[in-house]
Amino acid sequence: MSAAVADGLTAEYVQLQPGPFTGQWTVVCTRTTVVQIGREDVAVVRRLRVPRRRWAVIVPLIVPAAARWNASAMRPQDVLICAPGTECFAFDPPGTRFAVLTFATSTTTSTRLARLAAECAPSGVATLRDEDAAALGEEILRLGTRGRSHAVDLGRLFRTCLMRATPRMRQVDSAVGRSQIVQRVEEFCRRHAGEPLSIAQLSSVAGVSERSLRNAFYDVYTTSPKRYLKLLQLHQVRRALRAVCGEDGTVTNVATLHGFYELGRFAGEYKALFGEAPSQTLHKARARKPSSPLGLA
């Protein structure tokens, strides 16, 4: 689904429950706005990066109470404002549905977003009026089915929602620090892919105690750092297998490059999570054209 994300956004998904990934991503482009509607049928961790010349607003459509966006529980009337060049982190339970609205930094809507984001700092969580949130959700869903012809009404409604939005209560601000801990650890793990990393080492990198590290991961991703990083490794292998060109790449080479040396155990964990053996992933990648990436990335 990452391959379907548009308007300069980049997304990474880490699947938390076993089985084939299923979901949907709909993109509607207008003159001033890109509306992207996502649905995930399995529990995932989602990491979204916003380009430097875009503002992004993430709107909950159907979001279970267990969901966490930047370590904050999101209510139906909340939206998450993501400034240009930033990242947001989410745990989405099965059945989560949301929309991402993006605006160029040169638009008048972005001017209002900048003011509201400053008021909501550092959490970025703003609260809409109940009636505004309900109307916005309905318009987004209509746009997803009717397409671009309905976008003018959505743009007007969204600007009205922004004018009447308020910052969420400050108790969510502590979530920002936990998101930063997770971000530092993830970046370190990506730079040291394939190396054995201990929880003690990761807590030192993050500058917190092991207990604080565990709490941060549970708050942001609702799972332990050890389990999350193992799943991240498996996804890195999956991406690498899908990117293999020609006959030189092998499952063994890719797996060991990412720190998996017990190949039988690795193959079992991989198949349990993704519903197919790593050799099947590699075979499909070789059969596909390089310009046609599919599925979860």
Q: Language-model features: where?
A:
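Alpha-helical bundle regulatory/interaction domains
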Residues: 1-16, 56-57, 64-193, 198-200, ...
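Short hydrophobic/aromatic patch on the recognition helix
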Residues: 213, 217, 265-266, 270
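Alpha-helical DNA-recognition elements
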Residues: 219-220, 272-273, 284
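Nucleic acid-binding interface residues in structured DNA/RNA-binding domains
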Residues: 235, 271, 277
